[in-house]
Amino acid sequence: MDTGLDRSRAALIRLPLRYGLLLVPAVFLALFYFYPLVSILAVGLAPGGQPDLTGFAEIVTSAYYRHTLGFTLAQAALSTALTLLLALPGAYVFARYDFQAKSLLMALATLPFVLPTVVVAAAFSALVGPRGLVNEGLMSLLGLESPPVQLERTLAIILIVHVFYNYAVALRIIGSYWANQNPRMEEAARVLGAAGWRLPILRPALLAAGTLVFIFTFTSFGVVLILGGPRFATLEVEIYRQTANLLNLPMAAALSLVQIGLMLVMMAIYTRMQRRTAADVVSAASAVRPPRSRRARALVFGNLLFMAVMLFAPLLALVARSFTAGGEGFTTRYYELLFANVRGSVLFVPPMRAVGNSLVFALATTVLAVALGLITVYLLSQRGSRWANWLDPLFMLPLATSAVTLGFGYIIALDEPPLNLRASPVLIPLAHTLVAMPFVVRSVLPAKRSITPHLPEAARVLGASPWQVWRFIDLPLISRGLIVGAVFAFTVSMGEFGASLFIARPDTPTMPVVIFRLLGQPGAANYGQALAMSVLLMVVCAVGFILIERLRTVGMGEF
């Protein structure tokens, strides 16, 4: 018979286990997140071992760094305004109208957001670049000798790609909030004489979406680096240039600290705005209706046409150009070149080796992220735990830190004993795990918390061991969320670019790093190989995203 004494003994036995488990993700976070950030702080504030704020003073006094900071803020503000402006009609359509394939279109609209930046850069290069489909078509049609559409290395292409990336973010946040508002309030407002362009009810959602888009575009790296060229630099790009090109680590550290400070402010604003987007849910029948009028059908069709052109045309152009980049007609030559190590190539290994590297790193990342994520979920889901309230945001901190800052921290922190991992390929899956683990936690934690405590308690009363409770009760109930988290981890690792560009060795490059290097080299062969590898990476990410959407439980999970 189970007595209170027996339960007390069992609790005492589980206590060391719980704290022992806590040490595993805590040590991982301390070694591979906080230690690199503290190293950046030390280099930025005391580059020679003595307090020195010269780097910060130069940021304030130098016109170049003031311009870099100003451009970072300006392009983020412009990108945010354009994204909200273009996503608002689409959010209204998805919130108020019911039409065929609505769920599928929403899922497809989100696909660009999960694509690696190098793939998106290659896609827009294939569509509107000097050798893109648009310019080749216009040159052939009009008999021109030079490309008429000159968007490469302009602010316009940066803004367009930022809208491409973040359209789905605004569409989902504003659309879901709008769908939860009773349309009778709009009708009552019209009766009382309100104009159609007032948006007080949507203001929290607009501010939340705008803040999140601003954060994403403020930390833009791959888009500006690849498509903007040397003319443009965000803080992210400047940190990379100061480190990789100029070896000016104190200045890179100072810029990193400035960016971290600004990011903390923006994340605080976003968290506050997100809490204000809570709304009463109304029945779908009262808010959603078929587009019966001509005006409604035109609005739905116009938005779907815009989404097709804006979101899908670049991806289709990428696939088409990967077979026709050299102008000699349809060919699989560029896919075949991925298996060859061409003499004089910018790469040290055949490009296809990078596919194997990325797969190995992604598998290792998935195993590590799932293992650490499950331990974290177990700790955070303990009912009545006083630790959960502050451990939860602590383990999410890597999501609020840019990959470039993280990669820079690894360079200066992990290059000497006892953690001399700078030349080790192990560093890549460790960095990827740090970014991927929060996705596992957010995918599994809601499912674990939804398990009624009576189930495991009843199993223990009937004599089940902790392992049996986990194997036969917890695991089946969280399995869908666990698979979603694992696929997230795999996809995030495959497409990670910012940190990998810092820490990947020349003989073990990842797919995004190879694409970046090939895009930076002249010649049709390099360009064609970059497009071909981008297609392969896009397919992997698309398959992963489709699996996530199919396995995701409605209303369960936070991504």
Language model features by range: what are they?
Residues 2, 6, 78-109, 122, ...:
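Transmembrane-helix boundary motif in ABC transporter permease subunits
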Residues 2-39, 103-109, 260, 264-267, ...:
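N-terminal signal-anchor/first transmembrane alpha helix
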Residues 5-19, 42-81, 96-97, 145-148, ...:
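Periplasmic/extracellular loop-to-transmembrane helix junction in inner-membrane transport proteins
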Residues 23-27, 81, 111, 115, ...:
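Transmembrane alpha-helices
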Residues 36, 170-173, 209-240, 317-321, ...:
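Non-cytoplasmic
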Residues 5-11, 53-58, 66, 101-102, ...:
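Membrane-interfacial helix termini and adjacent extracytoplasmic/periplasmic loops
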